[in-house]
Amino acid sequence: MSNNFKDDFEKNRQSIDTNSHQDHTEEVEKDQSELEHQDTIENTEQQFPPRNAQRRKRRRDLATNHNKQVHNESQTSEDNVQNEAGTIDDHQVESSHSTESQEPSHQDSTPQHEEEYYNKNAFAMDKSHPEPIEDNDKHETVKDAENNTEHSTVSDKSEAEQSQQPKPYFATGANQANTSKDKHDDVTVKQYKDESKDHHSGKKGAAIGAGTAGVAGAMAASKAKKHSNDAQNKSNSGKANNSTEDKASQDKSKEHHNGKKGAAIGAGTAGLAGGAASKSASAASKPHASNNASQNHDEHDHHDRDKERKKGGMAKVLLPLIAAVLIIGALAIFGGMALNNHNNGTKENKIANTNKNNADESKDKDTSKDASKDKSKSTDSDKSKEDQDKATKDESDNDQNNANQANNQAQNNQNQQQANQNQQQQQQRQGGGQRHTVNGQENLYRIAIQYYGSGSPENVEKIRRANGLSGNNIRNGQQIVIP
């Protein structure tokens, strides 16, 4: 056992390969068994490879496996194309036999349909593969064949040399780099092989297209010699058209990775178009006696159909008109009845409304009369009350006025008596006293001091009596009698 435990650890920590990589795992196990028998001293002295080396190796292995799967898919698609080409040829042969077994009729109509059929097929195939097929394509196919043979010989040589070379070590860095380079070369050689196989598949497609073109040309020549023009021939030819178009569409979807197959199919369609043209030219040169009879028969049938259509058309036109008139009449009758009922109802409503209005007016008049009577009664009572109040007021006013007059007379009498007394006193004072005019802020007290020498209450009272004063109020410019 070797001491290189790190390689075992790195191996175990990687993901487990799927069933598609069993061959690769067997080769790795063989390499590891051979490495175990080598010297352990050299392995211990050398450095360990980087961790990413095994990842890169795994990626290269996955790429090679993917290329193998793509190559297998391309081979299966080529086989399917070959099988479909065989089925197309069988359908075309069957359609030719069916046209031979049909009875001839309507000679002028079928060539036109066949020309349209072949022209449509040629136009559709030209649209799907617009590039024409020329001698350059043939020259390119020859060159591709030579290049493919060269690549195949180179790849075989490289595989033989690789099988003779000894297998490298996995332990050292230099050996690891050499192994990665060798495996990269292996990948490139496998890619060259895949490309060469693709070129071979393109050549197979071209051969298939040439075969179909030959079959189509033979069919066109055989159809040019025959006179099958029945309606069943049309249906059979339509079915053949649909089958060929479906097959062509399937071939287009499957021939996405093979460029030269479309060109081969275009050549086939060109052959079909040429056959159709030759058939139409041969059919145009034939007599048209039966066609004239069929046209006359069709014209008579057409006139009979027109007469029947006219008769049926008049009946179809009259029936809806009569039905429409009846419906309109019924609607008019029902409408008139509805209008009459509506008018009668409106009249009755008007009469009822007028009666109601008259009753309301009479009620309003009665209520207005009652209200006026009540108002008159209330006004009369109010007037009587007012008159009574006025009479009582007048009486009270008269009594008061009489009392006032008596009071006024008594007051007047008192005033006269007082005036007389005052006059008598003044006369008495004027006969024996003096006069003084009030100036400034003089009062009875000061005037008494001025004239009597003292302002005693007795002196002041004398002045008051002499002048008829009740209080101490005097004004400027007033003349006062001093007794």
UniProtKB/Swiss-Prot annotation:
PROSITE patterns: LYSM. SUPFAM superfamilies: LysM domain. Residues 434-482 form the LysM domain. Residues 14-34 are annotated as: Elastin-binding. Residues 204-222, 275-294, 400-428 have a biased composition (Low complexity). SMART domains: LysM. Its main location: membrane. InterPro entries: LysM_dom (IPR018392), LysM_dom_sf (IPR036779). The elastin-binding domain is located between residues 13-33 at the surface-exposed N-terminus, whereas the C-terminus, containing the LysM peptidoglycan-binding domain, is not exposed on the surface of intact cells and presumably remains buried within the peptidoglycan. The presence of the TNSHQD sequence, corresponding to residues 18-23, is essential for EbpS activity but not sufficient, additional flanking amino acids in the amino- or carboxy-terminal are required for elastin recognition. This is Elastin-binding protein EbpS.
